[in-house]
Amino acid sequence: MDRLNNLATQLEQNPAKGLDAITSKNPDDVVITAAYRTAHTKGGKGLFKDTSSSELLASLLEGLVKESKIDPKLIGDVVCGNVLAAGAGATEHRAACLVAGIPETVPFVALNRQCSSGLMAVNDVANKIRAGQIDIGIGCGVESMSNQYGPNSVTPFSNKFQNNEEAKKCLIPMGITSENVAAKYNVSRKAQDAFAAKSYEKAAAAQAAGKFDQEILPIKTTVLDDDDNEKEVTVNKDDGIRPGVTAEKLGKLKPAFSAEGTTHAGNASQISDGAGAVLLMRRSVAEKLGQPILAKFVHCKTVGVPPELMGIGPAYAIPAVLEDLGLTVNDVDVFEINEAFASQALFSIQHCGIDESKVNPRGGAIAIGHPLGATGARQFATLLSELKESGKKVGVTSMCIGTGMGAASLVVAE
């Protein structure tokens, strides 16, 4: 009867509330037993520039299975987020699972909810475990912006859509939405540059201290030099992190999207290549298999916001998750908020009343990079590593989503 009550609580639209509820341990909890990512490298310039998204994903999944020691035959589903590939990479990323040694009996699904795709993949697996459809699954995300980023990634709008005032806002360039947020909410250029410089500073310190080594799986690949000669390399470090970046230096950069604007290459996320993957399972199964439990996956929420202000998504997704759980921002120890742009990240932090010292302690996408479909999964690898090292418990991930949405999730470390 207790097990049925626990399961019923988990399946309710609104989960049990309060710190005691989220930190309790029940056999049917969804738990994370492994979370890894690849290094993130510069789009068109970095060591992954000649590596396809399918190759990236295959290498990461193979590494995840090896490091976790999970029997791949036990995996109930693999869900992969991707934004830029046709059909979210449904064909090539299914093939990547097979190359990684995951048997053909394990199904695969590709999904795309823009920059939250990696998180949506993790949440999809969690929901299937809660519903009793599977016991074990992998939620992952991957993006090769070197190979697939560009204007042709969006289908042209018909006259009907172009003449719909709300619908056509979905075509507003992301940089312009950043300018809209900065203008509407008075986020100054000076504040944005200071925030961006801090992201670089934190990321450089984390990299120098070897903190990212715990979350990054080295990937062997080949890269073409300037003479088109192939060279074998092992990629294990983010190459967009630059020590010595200051607000003063960033202040000299020209605006990228508007002559009078405040957004530029130094206070916006980097175009990047990379992947992330999270192994989830039912607590009772994890205990039976002797899998180390890193965290309990508690809740996830997605909200809609105006497309022209898409960056404010976290400002509304984070409170939505916390309200469902009967928590406040003060109950959260670490926030991983995607830095699509400094403007929107700063607004979201301030709108929610979050202590900025709790946000992105290892830096964020401005310094590390933002491979669109991978970020939501990457954040778990970074967050769980940080929670383990710091001894803290409650963590939140969040991001804005192109076309006007925001998503957030909450985990409790063990």
Swiss-Prot record:
Cellular compartment(s): Peroxisome
Enzyme class: transferase
The keyword Cell inner membrane appears for this protein: no
Family: Belongs to the thiolase-like superfamily. Thiolase family.
Name recorded for this polypeptide: 3-ketoacyl-CoA thiolase, peroxisomal
Pathway per the UniProt entry: Lipid metabolism; fatty acid metabolism
EC number of the protein: 2.3.1.16
Keyword terms: Acyltransferase, Fatty acid metabolism, Lipid metabolism, Peroxisome, Transferase, Transit peptide
Primary role: Responsible for the thiolytic cleavage of straight chain 3-keto fatty acyl-CoAs (3-oxoacyl-CoAs).
